Structure formats: C-alpha cells, structure tokens
C-alpha cells in the first residue's frame, strides 16, 4: 500500500499509526496537545518511538461528543499538519468524516484520510479522496446496533463502502479497512469482532485495528480510560496475530 511517498509492505509487517488529537475533549488525550507547540512535542516523541504514520484528529469521536463546524476543525488540524510536513518524513493521516476538512488537510500535506463513516456520512468525501488520489482508511460504522448476522453484516457494510470508493475512482492500493471497534456495536459485538477480525482481510485490503483505551477494554477490566494501557497492548497484539497490517 502506498501512503504519501512511502510504500508499506502490508503482507509481512504491522505498522503503527500514532494518535495526535488536537482537541479539548477526546477521551484518551483530549486537551493535552491542542496547542501547536504541545502537539509538535508529542509528535517528536512518537517519531523517536518509531511511529509509522501520524493520525491528526480535530474533533473528538468519543461517545456523546459535540460536533464542531468544518471551519473550526480546519483551524485545529491544518496548522499542525503543515508543521509536521516540514519537520518529519512520516506520512500524515487526518481523522475526519467531512470532505471540506479532508480537502483542506490534504492541501496542507495530509497523505491519508481516516474516515470513521467509511464514505457514508459525507457524499463528497469519496470524490475528494479520488481527486487527490490520497490513501484512505475506511471504517465500519452504523447509527444502530441492529444486525441479523453480525460478522456477515459488517462485511456487507464494508463491501458497500468499497463500492463507493471504486465508483469514485479511488485505486485499490490506496484503501485500508477498519472494523470499527467501539462504533455501532455493543460490548459483546466488539469482543466478537476481535475474535473474528481476520475475516475483514477476506475483502482483499489491508486492515487497521484501533482499540486504544476503548470502552471494550474498560468494561472487561473495570478500568477508567487512563488505566487501559495493558488492555490496549493485549488487544493490539491479538490484532497483529490475526494479520492486521496497521494498529492505531
């Protein structure tokens, strides 16, 4: 898979996407890095620790989050993306489901669009990604948790997302998929997805797994968000053992 100027050997390696939320309210690091200097310092820490991709988020996607305007999100993410582009030779992802934000981020230097709605929230998102031939991570998500056959339904939903990408002209080697742990799923469904996360690979694209500090871990271990490091590591290793090419 090609992201920016780098080729990722997704069949033989697992790569790390480092989270950098420039938000006041993200549940894992909200408020810590919402100044340019603090964000840049954290990016340097991640680079020193071997991160392969920076993932920049300007709006929290935690349960109950408050949606912000496109303009405010752009004001949050564009300065840090532009700065990272000049400081590091590391691909940059923008975590957004809004096409206006994605386009501004790409123009500032983003190499990948990480869309938690898999092209289904903003009908112009696929067009923007195709226009710039940017890489994309397309996540499974739903507004409800009503499934007939959970794993099969998730695969069918992702097939719809892939079709949207293809219709827009997004090339196969620009696509990765995310099973969407913690999004549109109950606690039990999240556990089942962890058990069968390798099923996502049958669709023919690299898979990204993101479990960092999520409620599934908290409910299993009865721990608050700031004490879920070990659970995050365990679920990440499970994903690696099951063939995930990227972990977030």
What are these regions (language model features)?
Residues 16, 21, 26, 54, ...:
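Conserved, well-structured ligand/cofactor-binding cores
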Residues 1-24, 166-170, 223:
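N-terminal amphipathic alpha-helix/helix-capping segment at the start of soluble metabolic enzymes
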Residues 44-48, 159-174:
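Phosphate/pyrophosphate-binding loops at sites that engage ATP/ADP/AMP, CoA/4′-phosphopantetheine
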Residues 1, 9, 46, 51-53, ...:
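Active-site loop-to-helix "anion-binding N-cap" substructures in soluble metabolic enzymes
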Residues 41-57, 243:
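Catalytic domains of carbohydrate-active enzymes, especially glycoside hydrolases
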């Amino acid at each position: 898979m090609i992201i920016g100027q780098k080729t990722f050997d997704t069949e033989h390696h697992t790569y790390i996407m480092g989270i950098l939320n420039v938000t006041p309210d993200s549940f894992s690091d909200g408020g810590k890095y919402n100044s340019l200097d603090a964000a840049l310092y954290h990016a340097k820490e991640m680079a020193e620790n071997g991160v392969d991709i920076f993932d920049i988020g300007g709006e929290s996607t935690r349960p109950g989050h408050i949606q912000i305007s496109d303009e405010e999100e752009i004001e949050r993410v564009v300065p840090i993306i532009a700065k990272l582009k000049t400081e590091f030779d590391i691909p940059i992802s923008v975590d957004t489901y809004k096409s206006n934000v994605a386009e501004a981020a790409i123009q500032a230097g983003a190499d990948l669009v990480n869309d938690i709605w898999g092209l289904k929230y903003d009908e112009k998102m696929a067009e923007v990604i195709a226009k710039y031939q940017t890489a994309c991570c397309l996540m499974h998500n739903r507004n409800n948790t009503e499934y007939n056959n959970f794993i099969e339904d998730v695969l069918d939903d992702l097939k719809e997302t892939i079709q949207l990408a293809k219709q827009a002209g997004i090339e196969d080697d620009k696509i990765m998929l995310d099973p969407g742990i913690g999004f549109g799923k109950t606690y039990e469904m999240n556990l089942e997805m962890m058990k069968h996360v390798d099923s996502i690979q049958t669709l023919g694209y690299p898979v990204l797994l993101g479990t960092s500090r999520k409620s599934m871990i908290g409910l299993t271990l009865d721990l608050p968000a700031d004490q879920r490091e070990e659970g995050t590591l365990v679920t990440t290793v499970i994903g690696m053992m099951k063939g995930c090419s990227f972990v977030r």
